[in-house]
Regions:
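N-terminal secretory signal peptides that target proteins for export/translocation
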Residues: 1-27
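N-terminal export leaders
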Residues: 28-32
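Bacterial N-terminal signal peptides
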Residues: 34-43
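C-terminal/domain-edge helix-coil "capping" segments
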Residues: 47-79, 169-172, 178-245
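N-terminal segment of the mature soluble domain
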Residues: 78-152, 191-194, 221, 225-239
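Short acidic, glycine/proline-rich loop/turn micro-motifs
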Residues: 94, 163-164, 208-211
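Surface-exposed short loop/turn segments
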Residues: 132-191
C-alpha cells in the first residue's frame, strides 16, 4: 500500500454571496477560451497558439537539449570548450559547395551567442587541409586541439529543390550528430563517443516555395540559417518560445 494514491476529501465551502460571485477572477479555463478566440481572430497558427497558451500559464519554460539530457553536460553552465566540425558527401559538395562551411559558421555563431567557448573553425579547417583534406577520427582532433567536447555533424544529404518540380523550392536534409568528450588516457588524449542523434529537416513542411518568389541562393541561405538553429538546439538548452519546429 506504500505506493497507492490516496484521494483527499473535498472541503465544504459556504455559498458565495452575489457580490463575491461578481468579483471573482476568471478561471484558467476562461482565460484559455479567451486566448483561443483571440488567436483565431488574429489568424495565428496552432504553433503560436500553444506558445502563447504555454507562456500564459507557465511562463517561458526552459527546454533541456538532447545533448544535455543524454550526456549530463551543460555546455553553458559547465563552461566547456567545443570543437564543431561538419562533413558532407561528394554529392552534396558538388552541388552545394559552400553548405559545409556555411552550416559550420552559422552553428558556431549560435553557440557563441550562448557564451559557449568554441575552437576557431579556421584553425580546424587549416589542420584538415594540412592533412590532405581528411581527418581519421575524433581522437585525432582531440590530440591536436584543446577541446572538452567534439561535435561532428555528418550530413548525409542536402537539397533545396522540390523533387520532380524544378520551379519549386523546398529544403531537405538528413544526417547524424555525434558528440565526444575528450579524456586523457595515460599520456594521450582520446575522444569517447557519448552522444548520437539522427536528424531530418524539411522546410517548409507544408507548401514549397515558388522559384519565382525567391532566388535559389536566398532560399538556401534561409534554410541553412534554420538548420543551424535546429542543430544548435540539440546542443544547448533553450526557451520553449525559441523552438524551431
Amino acid at each position: 500500500m506504500d505506493d497507492a494514491l490516496t484521494a483527499l476529501p473535498l472541503q465544504q465551502t459556504p455559498p458565495e454571496s452575489e457580490s463575491r460571485k461578481g468579483n471573482r477572477l476568471p478561471t484558467r479555463s476562461q482565460f484559455l477560451f479567451a486566448l483561443v478566440v483571440t488567436c483565431l481572430a488574429c489568424n495565428l497558427t496552432g504553433c503560436s497558439l500553444f506558445v502563447m497558451a504555454g507562456k500564459l500559464f507557465f511562463g517561458d519554460p526552459k527546454m533541456m537539449s538532447p545533448f544535455h539530457a543524454g550526456t549530463g553536460y551543460d555546455l553553458v553552465e559547465d563552461e566547456l570548450t567545443v570543437l564543431v566540425i561538419f562533413s558532407t558527401p561528394e554529392s552534396v559538395k558538388s552541388e552545394f559547395s559552400s553548405v559545409e562551411y556555411d552550416l559550420t559558421e552559422e552553428t558556431i555563431r549560435r553557440l557563441k551567442r550562448r557564451d559557449i567557448k568554441v575552437i576557431d573553425p579556421d584553425d580546424v579547417a587549416t589542420f584538415i587541409d594540412d592533412n590532405g583534406g581528411y581527418w581519421e577520427d575524433a581522437s585525432e582532433l582531440a590530440r591536436h586541439f584543446d577541446a572538452d567536447i567534439i561535435v561532428h555533424v555528418d550530413l548525409d544529404s542536402f537539397t533545396c529543390d522540390e523533387e520532380n518540380s524544378p520551379s519549386l523550392l523546398r529544403g531537405r536534409a538528413d544526417g547524424i550528430v555525434y558528440g565526444y568528450d575528450v579524456r586523457k588516457v595515460g599520456d594521450e588524449k582520446v575522444a569517447r563517443e557519448i552522444f548520437v542523434r539522427e536528424f531530418t529537416s524539411t522546410h517548409p513542411r507544408q507548401t514549397p516555395v515558388s522559384a519565382d518568389s525567391s532566388s535559389r541562393s536566398a532560399f538556401q541561405k534561409r534554410y541553412v540559417d534554420l538548420m543551424a538553429t535546429q542543430i544548435a538546439q540539440m546542443l544547448y538548452d533553450y526557451h520553449a518560445s525559441e523552438l524551431i519546429r
